[in-house]
Amino acid sequence: MAKKGNRVQVILECTEHKTSGQPGTSRYITTKNKKNTPDRIELKKFNPILKKMTVHKEIK
C-alpha cells in the first residue's frame, strides 16, 4: 500500500489587515511539505484591499 504524501494545503491570512479596520480579509491557499517545514509559514503576498505587499501567516 502506498504512503500518503507529505504535502498539505494551508491557508495564509494577512496580519496587517486586522489592525487597519477595513472590512474583509485577504487569504491565500498554498501547499507546504510537512517534513521540511513543520512550523507555521509566513510569506509576503499582495493584499488587494490594502493594495500593497503584506505578511501572510498560516492559520488553523
Swiss-Prot record:
Domain of life of the organism encoding this protein: Bacteria
GO terms of biological process kind: translation
Keywords of the record: Ribonucleoprotein, Ribosomal protein
Pfam family of the protein (one): Ribosomal_L33
Record family assignment: Belongs to the bacterial ribosomal protein bL33 family.
The keyword Ribonucleoprotein appears for this protein: yes
Tagged with keyword Ribosomal protein: yes
Name used for this protein in its record: Large ribosomal subunit protein bL33
Taxonomic lineage from the root: Bacteria, Pseudomonadati, Bacteroidota, Flavobacteriia, Flavobacteriales
GO molecular function, one term: structural constituent of ribosome
InterPro entries tied to this protein: Ribosomal_bL33, Ribosomal_bL33_sf, Ribosomal_zn-bd
GO CC annotation: cytoplasm; ribonucleoprotein complex; ribosome
